From Swiss-Prot:
Assembly information from the UniProt record: Homodimer.
Lineage: Eukaryota, Metazoa, Ecdysozoa, Nematoda, Chromadorea
Pfam families the record matches: ER
SUPFAM superfamilies documented for this protein: ERH-like
The protein's name: Enhancer of rudimentary homolog
Protein purpose: May have a role in the cell cycle.
MF terms in GO: identical protein binding
Amino acid sequence: MSHTILLLQPTDNIESRSWSDYENTTECLEGICRVYEEYLKKKVPAQNEITYDISHLFEFIDDLKDLSMLVLDNTTYTYVPHNKQYVKESIYKLMNNRLNNQH
């Protein structure tokens, strides 16, 4: 896996822009899920356990002003940009693999 940079802008306000870097793409995808889980905790602070459907996570991603991943290509040593659709497909594959490995 390759070094990955997450670019995030939740609202129209450019001051809401942030970035995070991760050792690999899987860690970045898990980071995106944690951002959503933190959002849910703030939305419903009295709820002890957070559960959600992946479709709600995808709606959250769609509602963000911008979300992009830059993934290092180890052959060219350049970062390849990926959009929200790629992120959602990658999260789906990650969750599906984890579900299949539990059985």
